[in-house]
Amino acid sequence: MKNGKYVILCIDDDKDVIDSLRVILESNNYIMVEAFSAEEGLKKYTASNPDFVIVDLMMESVDAGRAFVKELQILNNKAPIYMLSSVGDSLASNIDFSELGLTGVFQKPLDINTLLSTLKIKLK
């Protein structure tokens, strides 16, 4: 938390997704920290100490999102981590999300109400 607002780290290589998340989050009184790759996401994670993490499953490499989450486990992450996944993403259907260390999954296109209600519940 920073200045009384929750910090949300969003990692996705799609600028349109990042821009959409920024509009939604900032208009609902959250601070958004962005990253466009898993590597950049790790740097932003350690610098910002986020309260909640949203990471795309498929980024610059097929399992960049998974590798990022594993790195957070090594860092003893306590923030809820939600993976972004495309509807019908065959890789997503083959992953045990809880075993990977994820709190949950958001399907693309992202439903604003689902995002905001999840944040409200998980950040109590």
Model regions: which residues?
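Non-catalytic signal-transmission and effector/linker regions of two-component phosphorelay proteins
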Residues: 1-7, 111-124
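The short loop immediately C-terminal to the conserved phospho-acceptor aspartate in CheY-like receiver
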Residues: 14, 58-60
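Two-component/phosphorelay signaling modules centered on CheY-like receiver
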Residues: 15-33, 100
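Helix N-cap/capping motif at the beta->alpha junctions
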Residues: 34-43, 64-65
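Conserved phosphotransfer cores of two-component systems
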Residues: 46-48, 72-78, 100
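Active-site beta3 strand of CheY-like receiver
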Residues: 48-55
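Alpha4 helix (beta4-alpha4-beta5 surface) of REC/receiver domains from two-component response regulators
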Residues: 63-67, 74, 88-106, 113, ...
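Hydrophobic/aromatic residues positioned on beta-strands within the core alpha/beta folds
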Residues: 84-86
